[in-house]
From Swiss-Prot:
Function: Catalyzes the initial step of the lipid cycle reactions in the biosynthesis of the cell wall peptidoglycan: transfers peptidoglycan precursor phospho-MurNAc-pentapeptide from UDP-MurNAc-pentapeptide onto the lipid carrier undecaprenyl phosphate, yielding undecaprenyl-pyrophosphoryl-MurNAc-pentapeptide, known as lipid I.
BP GO terms, sorted: cell division; cell wall organization; peptidoglycan biosynthetic process; regulation of cell shape
Pathway: Cell wall biogenesis; peptidoglycan biosynthesis
InterPro entries the UniProt entry points to: Glycosyl_transferase_4 (IPR000715), PNAcMuramoyl-5peptid_Trfase (IPR003524), PNAcMuramoyl-5peptid_Trfase_CS (IPR018480)
Lineage: Bacteria, Bacillati, Actinomycetota, Actinomycetes, Bifidobacteriales
Tagged with keyword Chloroplast: no
Cofactor dependency: Mg(2+)
Gene name of this polypeptide: mraY
Protein name, entry field: Phospho-N-acetylmuramoyl-pentapeptide-transferase
Keywords: Cell cycle, Cell division, Cell membrane, Cell shape, Cell wall biogenesis/degradation, Magnesium, Membrane, Metal-binding, Peptidoglycan synthesis, Transferase, Transmembrane, Transmembrane helix
Localization of this protein: Cell membrane
Species of the source: Bifidobacterium adolescentis (strain ATCC 15703 / DSM 20083 / NCTC 11814 / E194a)
Principal localisation: membrane
E.C. number: 2.7.8.13
Entries under NCBIfam families matching the protein: mraY (TIGR00445)
Length: 365
């Protein structure tokens, strides 16, 4: 518990202290956000707002976990787990890809950075590296960092092992690529209003911190009664999820309306990569659809808008993603953000109830 508190406190201090320093640096370098011309006209005043805020979020999560790991090493002789390193790799690698995208935007002085093809290739390479390492690297607990299958909670309802190990690895790589691409793009789409992505991500990662801690408390081989989980190093996952939630909380102090800084793709892609990796590491890939329900709604609204327009040349929403639809209906930006936070809270609550209900059912209580 002390290691968890240390991680949380370090992450909070890094974001609270580091974000204003980054704002000054970005101002000095003149790295401001460029606003899409087809967006709501009310957003044009945000042009020039410092971006690259995701750098602080990434740094806060890493330093928070490293501080926690150092404490455990000095007091108990515990070495860092590969599971934690892999989850952080997913976050940092996607964050680095987002940083390249953000840097391209400010260099070209426009709202578009990397090409769709370039971003896809980058995500494919990084997700594939993560997938292969997750299956082959050893862990302290003896449980694999990932399962070659699809899970709602814990045990796969569909295993990729049906046709041998090679096929299982190939299918798992495809599955991980889908998850990484889906969640990075989902949180990226959500990052369209001041504080929306940061606040929603904070709520989602609080949910994952609770899930991972419950899996740690009921880890297979423990003395606690009830169903136990064969999850690799869930305490590390708890700490990382908690650090991510706190990092978003600290960043939100400066990102709330009117935002003093944007997280940019450096932040949204990193948070998406971390969310995907947490779902894989905790064996809750399909539960994540509910846990990150707001991100799913944002993504589906964009898909529906594009698909319907291509078929009929008409629009379902005034603008997509759906948060812009409510803006154009006359809702103040702050009202949209707070209500969307409330929706995400409900999704997380539903996911936690389902997770606990599954544990009760499997425990026979």
């Amino acid at each position: 518990m002390i290691s968890l508190i240390i991680g949380i406190m370090v992450s909070l201090v890094v974001t609270i202290v580091g974000t204003p320093l980054l704002i000054k640096l970005v101002h000095k370098l003149n790295y401001g956000q460029y606003i899409r011309q087809d967006g709501p006209k009310s957003h044009l005043v945000k042009r020039g707002t410092p971006t690259l805020g995701g750098v602080v979020i990434n740094l806060a999560v890493v330093l928070g976990w490293c501080s926690s790991a150092l404490y455990r090493f000095l007091t108990r002789g515990e070495v860092p787990s590969w599971s934690a390193v892999l989850v952080l790799f997913a976050m940092l690698s996607m964050g680095f890809l987002g940083f390249i995208d953000d840097f391209a935007k400010v260099r070209k002085k426009q709202s578009e950075g990397l090409t769709v093809k370039g971003k896809f290739i980058g995500q494919f390479i990084l997700a594939t590296i993560y997938a292969v390492l997750a299956l082959i690297l050893p862990t302290k607990s003896g449980f694999p960092s990932a399962q070659a299958g699809m899970s709602f909670i814990e045990k796969p309802f569909f295993s990729f092992e049906f046709a041998g190990r090679v096929v299982a690895i190939v299918l798992f790589v495809i599955w991980v690529n889908f998850l990484m691409t889906a969640w990075t793009n989902a949180i990226n789409l959500t990052d369209g209003l001041d504080g929306l992505a940061a606040g929603s991500s904070m709520i989602a990662f609080i949910g994952y911190a609770i899930i991972a801690f419950w899996e740690f408390y009921h880890l297979k081989g423990s003395d606690h009664p009830g169903f136990t989980y064969a999850v690799s190093d869930p305490l590390d996952l708890t700490i990382i999820a908690a650090c991510a939630a706190v990092a978003c909380f600290g960043f939100l102090w400066y990102n709330s309306n009117p935002a003093s800084i944007f997280m940019g793709d450096t932040g949204s892609l990193a948070l998406g990569g971390l969310f995907a990796a947490m779902s894989i590491a905790t064996h809750t890939e399909f539960l994540a659809i509910i846990l990150g329900g707001l991100f799913v709604i944002e993504t589906m609204s964009d898909i529906i808008q594009v698909g319907y327009f291509k078929m009929t040349h008409k629009r379902v929403f005034k603008m997509a993603p759906i948060h812009h639809h409510f803006e154009l209906k006359g809702w103040p930006e702050v009202k949209v953000v707070v209500r969307f936070w409330m929706i995400e809270m409900l999704f997380v609550l539903i996911a936690l109830v389902l997770f606990y209900g599954d544990w009760v059912a499997r425990s026979g209580l």
